[in-house]
Swiss-Prot record:
Organism, scientific name: Homo sapiens
Name of the coding gene: RTL3
UniProt miscellaneous comment: RTL3 is one of at least 11 genes called Mar or Mart related to long terminal repeat retrotransposons. They do not correspond to functional retrotransposons, but rather to neofunctionalized retrotransposons genes.
Name of the protein described by the UniProt record: Retrotransposon Gag-like protein 3
Main location: nucleus
InterPro entries tied to this protein: DUF4939, RTL1-rel, Znf_CCHC, Znf_CCHC_sf
């Protein structure tokens, strides 16, 4: 059940990380595009300014003839003043037209001098003056009415310039308005040349790909143990604190977090011993004390994480109440085996202070161990006292064969209570038969529960006698 919850938790967490990476990538892409907008606006504004300048330069030579048309119109208006005495239809009067035409040629340059026009106007007016005689010469044999008809379109020329200038002025206002609109409201779709657009897309795509790779490397390499090669980088910080103080109510939550961490970052710990050491560093309080005891006795559980986790779960997630633990710790006594582990397992369920546990631990020690402790330097805390006891218990026995032969002789019978180091643990419900199975998996002695030998080589009692003692204790 816990593994299923851990698996579902990991799946949800991975999906969340992927969504967060996608959102971050989109935000960076949006930021990159927004950073490119001012440059595009500047380039577009420069292009618009160049187009407006070119269009204004192209329109300037067209405006010059407009200003030059009024003098030409004035000349066309002056001709009828000289032609008024020519109204009689006498054919002889047609000959004197030549002097007025020549006189007009002289007056044409005089009029621009009084008005002081630029040189461009002077260069353009002589053709106007020459055109008038040519028209008049072609109309010489014709009637004066034809001349007046030919002059009427010329008289209408002064009316054309204002009409022509009005539509030319309107685009100027429209262009200025267009400039203001361009500056105030930048268009979302700016026209770009195909080559510029391709370069911009290539540059933006390259930048976004590099930034995306950096983000993915920092997150995926730390969160996914089987990430592709090249994406492994610095570890991503945990979103929760992986700690356990020994509270049985918080153990399931700690195990879920631990399983998810092992699935995600298990590759960071090449050996099971390194992983167990990491888990032990997360302990505090009673759990830290229990782990320190395993370090002191060099338990094989420290080398196998698969055996360490079940023992941890059975130790701190046992429904044993404080009353039973209180009874068991008073019944605990030492025979010829270790008592430190059993004392520590029972003390987990009690809220006693260190001084009380110190006194109770000394009461459960064998007299030989107490005598040896009196000749050594006193310990400063309970952990040092337990370490001294373990070192004294592990001293070689001068007559192990005699003990083993006596143990074998007493095999069919139930051993006395003082020769059973696990008698109190067997009587205590905290030590169950499932724990013996875990000791077997942890390569511990199935009789005393400590490393260095197996049950068949145990100097106290063989494995068969231990099973018989368990059956009698249960009965």
């Amino acid at each position: 059940m816990v593994e299923d919850l851990a698996a579902s938790y990991i799946v949800l967490k991975l999906e969340n990380e992927i969504r967060q990476a996608q959102v971050q990538w989109l935000m960076e892409e949006n930021a990159a595009l927004q950073a490119q907008i001012p440059e595009l606006q500047k380039s577009q504004a420069a292009k618009e300014y160049d187009l407006l300048r070119k269009s204004s330069e192209a329109k300037e030579p067209q405006k010059l003839p407009e200003h030059m048309n009024p003098p030409a119109a004035w000349e066309a208006q002056k001709t009828p003043e000289f032609k008024e005495p020519q109204k009689p239809p006498e054919p002889q009067d047609l000959l004197p037209w030549e002097p007025p035409a020549a006189w007009e040629l002289q007056e044409a340059p005089a009029a621009p001098e009084s008005l002081a026009p630029p040189a461009t106007r002077e260069s353009q007016k002589p053709p106007m003056a020459h055109e008038i005689p040519t028209v008049l010469e072609g109309q010489g044999p014709a009637n004066t009415q034809d001349a007046t008809i030919a002059q009427e379109p010329k008289n209408s020329e002064p009316q054309d310039p204002p009409n022509i200038e009005k539509p030319q002025e309107a685009p100027e206002y429209q262009e200025t308005a267009a400039q203001l609109e361009f500056l105030e409201l930048p268009p979302p779709q700016e026209p770009l040349e195909p080559s510029n657009a391709q370069e911009f897309l290539e540059l933006s795509a390259a930048q976004e790909s590099l930034e995306g790779l950096i983000v993915v490397e920092t997150s995926a390499a730390s969160e996914f143990p089987q990430a592709p090669i090249g994406l492994e980088a610095t570890d991503f910080p945990l979103q929760y604190t992986l700690t356990f103080s020994g509270d049985s109510q918080k153990l399931p939550e700690f195990l879920v977090q631990l399983y998810s961490y092992m699935r995600v970052r298990g590759h960071l710990y090449p050996t099971e011993a390194a992983l167990v050491s990491f888990v032990g560093n997360c302990f505090s309080g009673r759990a830290g004390w229990w782990f320190q005891l395993l370090l002191d006795i060099q338990s094989p559980l420290l080398e196998q994480c698969e055996s360490f986790i079940p023992v941890l779960q059975d130790t701190f997630d046992n429904p044993e109440n404080m009353k039973d633990a209180n009874q068991c710790i008073h019944q605990l006594c030492q025979g010829e085996g270790h008592v430190a582990t059993h004392f520590h397992l029972i003390a987990q369920e009690l809220n006693w202070d260190e001084s009380t546990l110190w006194i109770q631990f000394q009461e459960g020690l064998a007299s030989s161990i107490q005598d040896e402790l009196s000749h050594t330097s006193p310990a400063t805390n309970l952990s040092d006292l337990i370490t001294q006891c373990i070192s004294l218990e592990e001293k070689p026995d001068p007559n192990p064969l005699g003990k083993s032969s006596s143990a074998e002789g007493d095999g069919p019978e139930s051993p006395p209570a003082e020769n059973q180091p696990m008698q109190a643990a067997i009587n205590c419900p905290h030590i169950s038969e499932a724990e013996w199975v875990r000791w077997h998996k942890g390569r511990l002695c199935l009789y005393c529960g400590y490393p260095g030998h197996f049950a068949r080589d145990c100097p106290v009692k063989p494995h068969q006698a231990l099973q018989a003692g368990n059956i009698q204790a249960c009965q």
